[in-house]
């Protein structure tokens, strides 16, 4: 897993992101937390928290 992605997510806590996973799912929400292996977002569509492993990420877009 790219250290650049981990660093960018950790620096983006509280920001809105669009996450594309390797299984072709996509989630849009606000990053609420991150550690070395996982990160959590508040999914805007379902209004629920989702936890993902960094290894599941194909692409991530951080929106300011």
Predicted regions and their residues:
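Conserved RNA-binding domains used in RNP assembly and mRNA/RNA metabolism
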Residues: 2-64
